[in-house]
Amino acid sequence: MTSLGGFHFGRAVLPLLLETEKASPEFPPTLIFTSATAAMRGGANFASFATGKFAMRALSQSLAREFGPQGIHVVHAIIDGVIDIPRTKEWKFDKPDAKISPEAIADSYWHLHTQPRTSFTHEFDIRPYCEKW
């Protein structure tokens, strides 16, 4: 359902983003698809997960090519690591700062949204320094 959900969401929100594009020239409308490293390479026992993530990456690339010329910033963001949320508070790691801060993710997403049209980023990774990739 990963790519299907992204497809339906994109289909619903892109007309709204196109409407707001001219009203907000300083910060172009931004659509960020959050994904995982599985979008780049599959892993053993993760075929169904990787398939959905590969499809989401292709969807975001296609939408970026279709709607980028119309001023819509479409990004495929890879989050690779454990996010430091209440559900993962008790998870212990060998190194400090091994979990990704939600605030750091938000800062990165805000940076994407505030990029000028002359230098859109279409794909990027967020991972802690100690993540093996």
For each feature predicted by the language model, list its residue ranges:
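Short acidic, glycine/proline-rich loop/turn micro-motifs
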Residues: 44-46, 87-92
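Catalytic loop of short-chain dehydrogenase/reductase
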Residues: 18, 22-55, 61, 65-68, ...
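C-terminal helical subdomain
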Residues: 69-72, 76-84, 91-133
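Hydrophobic positions on the long internal alpha-helix
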Residues: 9-13, 17, 60
